[in-house]
Amino acid sequence: MSEKATAETVSKSIADKHDFTKGSMSDSIVRLALPMILAQLVNVLYNIVDRMYLGHMPGDGRLALTGVGVAFPIITIINAFAGLCGSGGAPLCSIERGRGDEGKAERIMGNSLTLLLIFGVFLTGLGYLVKTPVLYLFGASDETIVYANAYMDVYLAGNLFVMLGLGMNPFIESQGFAKTGMLTVVIGAVLNLVLDPLFIFGLKLGVRGAAAATILSQFVSAVWVLRFLSGKKAILRLRISDLRLRGELVKQILALGLSGFTMSVTNSLVQIFCNASLQFYGGDLYVGAMTIIYSVREVVQMPMQGFTQGAQPVLGYNYGAGQNGRVKTGIRFVRRVTISYAVGVWAVLMLFPGAVVRLFNGEAALLEVAVVSMRWHFALFFFMAFQYIGQNVFVSLGKAKQAVFFSLFRKAILGVPLILILPHLWDLGIYGVLGAEPVTNVIGGLACYFTMMRLVWKKL
């Protein structure tokens, strides 16, 4: 057999292996979702470990933790642009692969890379220009601004690498190479876990060391992603000819990615308004408590996010292939797993909040405030499952308008106004700020889910 024939046979066997119209839907989803969950959990955990180390720094640990917590909404907004390209382009690739148009799928991937490069350079420059006033606006005090600025100075220097790794990894996962996608994150995470204590404590770099460890780790992850997508093992490959922006593709990528982008940005906006309100009503102590709570939230939400994102290539591929019955089977499976998980997490956080808080900081005053705040914040957490289910279906099937609307509805339309209004009702004060989250979980989650059932489910 000739080399060309051998290559074609190998390519066909790889493609057949990743044909999601065959086999069990639940098996296909789990096969993709588990590595993605592990990868994203590791990714979140190594960011959380940064905060754990900083929270236990001798002397100024609480202030360092709070300062970095104030900076994280900015980082989340920057990373949302990576998601805009990755979460917008990768599902489109799955749909086009399902239709058999791999050429268009590769053009989508190439255009997504170009968009990432443009956004990365622009946001780095803008970040250096506006970071100090923005950090004050986001809840920094004169005591914590030093730590927030120090972290951002280093982080922005390597921001482009972070965006490339985060934005292009979904294109590995969307082709069915879930383990390779997981390795992207694991490589960076392990390196970060090694460098964190060395830079923070060994070299005595403090918050700058935490940022440097993150940037170096993400650089290695970005190189790994780009090498794989340019190599022979990938089904869809990066090609220089596909980097030229095409207006129609850019429009499709941004339209579909706008849902995840909006969700990330509005999450950050809620955190920003929450931090600013907590600073007003309670000071640095409450902002520090919320830094811990948002860190915990990142960890416990990630399995839901990873699982639903892992289902997207499978649902999108089958939808593109016209297999609507299999799509409904997949949605049922996602619903069952996601709701069960959310209820379990809620029970643990309600019963053992103190043990969780001590992982970050054991200071008595902070512990007391954080335990009460955590119970308020997660009081109705399990309703978040309905938001993830509905949002996942909208994105998987290319329903960009609905996906964007419900991202905005839960946080921008409900969350931010409630944070501003509830503290003034019945003199709730600080508890009004904390109570906004459970209210938005119920209303936003149920509205998204039942709209999906009416507009999408009935038509499948």
Feature annotation, model-predicted:
Residues M1-A33, C93-L160, G202-G257, L315-L380, ...:
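Short alpha-helical transmembrane segments in multi-pass integral membrane proteins
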Residues M36, Q40, M52, P91, ...:
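Transmembrane alpha-helix boundary and packing residues in multipass membrane permease domains
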Residues R62-P73, M152, A211, D284-V299, ...:
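Small-residue hotspots at the loop-to-helix junctions and early N-terminal turns
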Residues G86, Y155-E173, G181-A189, A210-V223, ...:
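Short runs within selected transmembrane alpha-helices of multi-pass transporters and secretion channels
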